[in-house]
């Protein structure tokens, strides 16, 4: 996979060039960062809320543009939500998932939605 930024945070290498998606990705990085600092129910709940909102927004854009990899992308989102819902405090896994999801899966829709 891709290297995990240290310090952990969004940087221009994660830019999809869709401002709403990039802004939401920044929020997700912040959510995972806060969870890494303090693994508590409030931080987990906030990350879950922001993640659900972001995935819904992204999926609506994909459906509207008939993005060909929509099903694969939605499945990746569902797997992450399941993992959050079954959270065991694995912050390292969450950091890695977001970095690799954006750079591998999200970048496929650059210029297509």
UniProtKB/Swiss-Prot annotation:
Gene Ontology MF terms: iron ion binding; oxygen carrier activity
CDD domains named in the record: Hemerythrin-like
Amino-acid biosynthesis is among the record's keywords: no
Amino acids binding Fe cation 1: 25, 54, 58, 106
Residue intervals passing through the bilayer: none
Cystine crosslinks: none
Binding site for Fe cation 2: 58, 73, 77, 101, 106
Highest taxon of source: Eukaryota
Keyword Cytoplasm: no
UniProtKB keywords: Iron, Metal-binding, Oxygen transport, Transport
Role summary: Hemerythrin is a respiratory protein in blood cells of certain marine worms. The oxygen-binding site in each chain contains two iron atoms.
Oligomeric form and interacting partners: Homooctamer.
Family per similarity comment: Belongs to the hemerythrin family.
UniProt protein name: Hemerythrin
């Amino acid at each position: 996979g891709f290297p995990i930024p240290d310090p952990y945070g969004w940087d221009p290498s994660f830019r999809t060039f869709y401002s709403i998606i990039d802004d939401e990705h920044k929020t997700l990085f912040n959510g995972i960062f806060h969870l890494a600092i303090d693994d508590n129910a409030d931080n987990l709940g906030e990350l879950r809320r922001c993640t659900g909102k972001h995935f819904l927004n992204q999926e609506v854009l994909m459906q509207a543009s008939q993005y060909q990899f929509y099903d694969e992308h939605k499945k990746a989102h569902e797997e992450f939500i399941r993992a959050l819902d079954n959270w065991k405090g694995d912050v390292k896994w969450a950091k890695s998932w977001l970095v690799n999801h954006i750079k591998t899966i999200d970048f496929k829709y650059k210029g297509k939605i």
